[in-house]
Amino acid sequence: SKTVPDLILKLSELLRFMLYECDKQLIPLNNELKVIRNYVELEELRYGERLKLRMKLPDAKELSAYMISPLIFLGFVENAFKHGVSAQLKDSFIEIEVVQYEGMVSLTVINSKFENTADNLGSKKGIGLENIKAQLDLIYPDRYTLIQEEQGNAFVTKLKIPVSE
């Protein structure tokens, strides 16, 4: 299949990022966005038509000068797939948007929220988001905003962090 080599390439890029970029304090924003694109494409293949996905990321060339801490954005995207896509239901959705402006970068992730399905029973409190919040407190103390809230049938995460050049 033509997609198998593409998948292997995306997976190898993800692994390379985890091995060689994650130990750095700051990385170019476009590197983080490339990892998100690869991760999302792998998940799209996994879920197929059960998932409606909308992703709006800025052009990578414009972002190479901006630096952020690695894996901050990816953690919220992973969480959306973990809790926002149902194995049983077909009306799952995820929206991801990144916007860069005036020394800041914002990530908005909106994902479907399911009531009482086997997909989310017992998974209300995980350590993933708590670890990301602790990381934000260490790296961006008093310089970030994080809003997480339920809005109807969706869970919304909005994060704003400063970028350095």
Model-derived segments and their meaning:
Residues 1-158:
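Two-component histidine phosphotransfer core
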Residues 162-165:
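C-terminal end segment of the histidine kinase catalytic
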